[in-house]
């Protein structure tokens, strides 16, 4: 009996020690450390709300965000308060040098362009937030890679996005655009020359078809299931974000995590079939498009394995294919839809762009070599990227004490670079910063920005978006072909509601009135 009492006493003591240790860790993580960092940040000159246990600013964050997205706004390009509502509220309340409590972790608003440049120039010191298992599942690949994996993958994938290689994909991009033009012409012809459509689903499918053809020699129909899986993963990930600031909260979302893994495995299986089918085709000696992204990626990793032994494994190749499908289509669709909205609103610029297309290309098929001569369309795309940057904000983290300019940033801090605030800042861009004026880019980006690193729609530095040139080529071709065939006008039913759902999208669609130019000639 005495032995059992002794064992029970020891077990009780061990349990008490474990509970005390766990309670101390919780206290350190959820109270002592945040309060210590809060004091340090205020000493650095940053202002924000006092830390509130566990939730920080998040209850207020969700309330403000919910209110902002509950209704559309009057048409204006001054969209910061709707796209980043709580950050806008905090900057207005506390100034540019401010912070938000994302649970127990502070997020500093970095508004100084030179500090943004320094952060993005040092990806090892100011790194992406990891581990981030949700992001790894939804996107993965190069976009979330870090450590030795990132430079190894970047070196190989760079070959696929070489400008000369990209030219080989343009015929596929052209076919995708031609299919969409044909669909729109059929709709217009059925309604005596003009009709109203919601352009957003068409543009989403066009972007998906372009990346399917250019990357895999496939098309949207064949890749439809992959895009459906990506959408379902994104919806689940968005739900995770609501409690992601609470430590260990994800461990209790057992059902959601299981579903996420099932979706991810099905996507991997779908992509594996595409990759293996391509490999078998090559082995049989059948002709394939050697310039599509998958062919270049497989060839580059094969050579790297032979020469350096550091190529990508088949699992890593499939992971990068997932990025092609998801990020590749999403960013292109966002840029193209906001370009259509802006041109439908600012018909003077639409006319100027169309005149340029007819002057450079004529009314026949697109000449790929002449895409670079479309200066006005390039100016328009830059202005759309400035006003409606796909990402809206960039996020980096510190895991140790870091020097940033004259500041010493403590560890366990996130750094938020609200791109949309930079892009709409009148101190940087002038009094018309919130107006649509592509003319500001008439002498190029450097002249428009006065040499400052303030135009970063595709990020900046070593981790700049590797597919940005491809996205610009895709959108430039699509815009040119649309303007060759149609005039565009915003419908009275259009509701202006930019929304940051991972990337910026039109919450209620993009209703435009299409008129077939051939019907008016």
Positions of PLM-derived features:
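Cytochrome P450 heme-binding "Cys pocket" and the immediately downstream C-terminal segment
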Residues: 221, 347-350, 415, 468-505
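Conserved cytochrome P450 K-helix E-x-x-R motif and the immediately C-terminal K′/meander segment
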Residues: 62, 72-95, 269, 273, ...
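Short, small-residue alpha-helix embedded
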Residues: 332-343, 478
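Cytochrome P450 heme-thiolate "Cys pocket" and heme-binding signature region
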Residues: 159, 322, 327, 393, ...
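Conserved cytochrome P450 K-helix/beta-meander segment immediately N-terminal to the heme-binding cysteine loop
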Residues: 417-446
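C-terminal helix/juxtamembrane-tail motif
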Residues: 1-4, 82, 487, 503-521
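Cytochrome P450 heme-thiolate monooxygenase catalytic core
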Residues: 2, 9, 35, 120, ...
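N-terminal membrane-proximal hinge/A-helix region immediately C-terminal to the signal-anchor transmembrane segment
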Residues: 2-138, 146-148, 152, 174-182, ...
